[in-house]
Each structure stands twice: as C-alpha cells, then as structure tokens.
Amino acid sequence: QYWENINFLKKFRRSHVGAVDQQLLLDTLQELGQSTINQLPAHIFKDKTNVLKGIHQVWALVAKRMIACDLYCPLTAETVIWVNQNDAFARNI
C-alpha cells in the first residue's frame, strides 16, 4: 500500500500551490490539529470551485511532505492529515 500511495502522490509533486494558499492551509490545519483531505478545504473555502482547488492543493502539500498522513493506509478523501512537524524547519529556510 505504501508504494501505491507514493506513486499516487508523484503526480502532485510538481503542482504549484501559491504562498498565500499554502500558508492558509497549513495555518488552518495547525489550528485544527488534524482534519481530512476533504474537510480542510471545505472548512476554509465556501464555494465548490475553491474547495476542489483546495483538495488538489492539499494533495500537493502531502506530496511535498508539508502535510503528513499515514502512508501505510489507502489514501482517500477521508484520510486524516496533520501538519508535518518534522518538515517545519525546511519550510522556514
């Protein structure tokens, strides 16, 4: 399952996430403690287009290891996510 998840996330590695959206997603997730792939964007954005864009951005941040999840379980819209504290140093460089 782990390798399936890594392969799934590869397509998001090069996705661009704007600095403002990235900070908004990470700050909100930090405040919440944890959320899911679908819930985080729905919590922030109110219109469907931005929620869908936000879901794509969350996957991109998971692929870039800024957001963490259990990669040994199947990745779904309900996957529990949290801010990757181990990668916080790299974000601040």
Residue ranges and their predicted role:
Residues Q1-I93:
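Electrostatic, structured charged patches in enzyme active sites and in nucleic-acid/phosphate-binding
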